[in-house]
């Protein structure tokens, strides 16, 4: 068995031709009738419709690993007693002997059920059970004539009656939105989904272990904020009845984490949800998981070094290699991550030439792309801001290999420290892989008076109609007035990192229950 957290995700076998459609409503009615009979039997003191006293002593994967290679004679001689439980996924009834396959959280294992072993009445009951029912079985291990490890059942119980039929075993859930909406069915029927989300959990655990191993303290900060802050984004609003005040779901934990740096914790991190009331796409979900971390006495170059090591380490622990494949194209984490300023990236990946330093040229180029004066206020923007817009429209998607993009304009980076030599830009970077932003970090602004002035500029922008501009956070400024050491901070999108590690095309594929329009 592989030591890596994310095993190779199996490729589903080609499906045979579809079987004739069966009316689900009819099947549900038949199953409800069976449950009705079970309840009636319970009322007469004959069993329990939903028993909860069966305790499986073994998992399918562990049994297969321990005994899968044993030969039939050895297993028979050992008479290994086992008890398993799971969902019945396959069933073949053949007179006095039948086979069923049950699936637990780890794998599947076959049951060999005979009338002689469990009794005529129990065998008759078993034949009435349906796929999807959850069963418990006791018996001994055996090998079939084809060499498949199986449980020769001596006791068999129905633990939960399934009222809804599972999708066709070969075709599964064909509708992608239905997979997202009914993730519980997707997990039952699609092994790749179970592998993917198990991998996500283990990779996040490895990430947490990495941070703690580097001296970071894990903390929890509020999800409900009296003032939204920490990022330029549109927040979700709610109302706190007891306090009788408007509150906001957090768009980022940044300002609270930096308060902790002021308080004397020199290295902190948080892995948690953030919320942004914005668009939904293959890269964006309004509720998403992010890790933010802050280290006193670090600057943005220290952060880039650390982030590079972090990404490589998690890839090693998760998939056992730093040479990945994403949607058929290689992603090489073994090479040093390229570091370019926004201007350098434009010159490298476009034919802008001297136009990169010409506001009029950039405005004209952006208009040709489809941006407008009315919506985007191009003529009101600085050269640095126009360069960012041109970068986002023409360069971003070309950054397939890991690349740090540096020196974002001060006007759009209200929490970042300005560059001492070029105060119009900041000591900030964004990490791009596969044409997508994976992280954002910078040397933190720790000048309280400068921060107050930046907040005032954000308030003016909000008054001019910028919904994503920040509010003025008086308490955060007050915290900075006590003095915050030089600090570096970074946020990494966990969902996008999981997309990369599991080769998933959409962010919805790595979020168990993504945001969807209400079902009609």
From Swiss-Prot:
The protein's enzyme class:
ligase
Show the GO cellular component annotation of the record: cytosol
Compartments where found: Cytoplasm
Give the residues the record marks as binding Mg(2+) 1: 430, 437
**Amino acids binding Mg(2+) 2:** 437
Q: Name one GO biological process term.
A: lysyl-tRNA aminoacylation
Which GO terms fall under molecular function for this chain's record? ATP binding; lysine-tRNA ligase activity; magnesium ion binding; tRNA binding
**Cofactor binding description:** Binds 3 Mg(2+) ions per subunit.
> Where does the secretion signal sit in this chain?
none
Subunit structure comment from the entry: Homodimer.
Mind telling me which NCBIfam families this protein's record contains?
A: lysS_bact, PRK00484.1
Give the similarity note: Belongs to the class-II aminoacyl-tRNA synthetase family.
Its name, as the record gives it, is: Lysine--tRNA ligase
């Amino acid at each position: 068995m592989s030591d890596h957290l994310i095993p190779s995700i199996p490729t589903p076998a080609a499906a045979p031709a579809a079987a004739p459609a069966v009316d689900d409503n009819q099947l549900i009615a038949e199953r409800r009738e069976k449950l009705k009979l079970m309840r009636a039997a319970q009322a007469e003191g004959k069993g329990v419709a939903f028993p909860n006293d069966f305790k499986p002593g073994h998992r399918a994967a562990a049994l297969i690993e321990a005994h899968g290679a044993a030969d039939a004679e050895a297993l028979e001689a050992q008479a290994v007693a086992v008890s398993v439980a799971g969902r019945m996924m396959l069933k073949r009834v053949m007179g006095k002997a039948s086979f069923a396959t049950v699936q637990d959280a780890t794998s599947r294992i076959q049951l060999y059920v005979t009338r002689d072993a469990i009794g005529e009445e129990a065998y008759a009951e078993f034949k009435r059970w349906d796929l999807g029912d959850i069963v418990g079985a006791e018996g001994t291990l055996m090998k079939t004539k084809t060499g498949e490890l199986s449980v020769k059942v001596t006791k068999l119980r129905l633990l939960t009656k399934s009222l809804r039929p599972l999708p066709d075993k070969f075709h599964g859930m064909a509708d992608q939105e239905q997979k997202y909406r009914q993730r519980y069915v997707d997990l039952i029927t699609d092994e790749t989904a179970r592998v993917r989300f198990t991998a996500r959990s283990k990779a996040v655990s490895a990430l947490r272990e990495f941070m703690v191993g580097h001296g970071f303290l894990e903390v929890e900060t509020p999800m409900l904020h009296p003032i939204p802050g920490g990022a330029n984004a549109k927040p979700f609003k709610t109302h706190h009845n007891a306090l009788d005040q408007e509150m906001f779901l957090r768009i980022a934990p940044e300002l609270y984490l930096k308060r902790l740096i002021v308080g004397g914790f020199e290295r902190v991190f948080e892995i948690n949800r953030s919320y942004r009331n914005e668009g939904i796409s293959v890269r964006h979900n309004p509720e998403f998981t992010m890790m933010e971390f802050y280290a006193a006495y670090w600057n943005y170059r220290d952060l880039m070094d650390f982030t590079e090591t972090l990404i490589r380490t998690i890839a090693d622990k998760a998939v056992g290699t730093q040479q990945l494949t994403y949607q058929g194209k290689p992603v090489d984490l073994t090479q040093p991550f390229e570091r370019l300023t926004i201007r350098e990236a434009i010159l490298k990946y476009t034919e802008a030439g001297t136009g990169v330093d010409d506001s009029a040229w950039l405005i004209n180029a952006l208009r040709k792309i489809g941006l407008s004066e009315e919506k985007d206020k191009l003529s009101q923007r600085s050269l640095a801001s126009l360069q960012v817009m041109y970068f986002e429209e023409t360069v971003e998607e070309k950054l397939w290999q890991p690349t740090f993009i540096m020196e974002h304009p001060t006007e759009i980076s209200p929490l970042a420290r300005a560059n001492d030599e070029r105060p119009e830009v900041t000591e900030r970077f964004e990490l791009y892989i596969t044409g997508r932003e994976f992280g954002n970090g910078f040397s933190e602004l720790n000048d309280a008076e400068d921060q107050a002035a930046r907040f005032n500029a954000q308030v003016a922008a909000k008054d001019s109609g910028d919904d994503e501009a920040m509010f003025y956070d008086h308490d955060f400024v007050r915290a900075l007035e006590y003095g915050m050491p030089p600090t570096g901070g970074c946020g990494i999108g966990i969902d996008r990192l999981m997309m990369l590690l599991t080769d998933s095309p959409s962010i919805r594929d790595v979020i168990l229950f993504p945001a969807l329009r209400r079902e009609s």
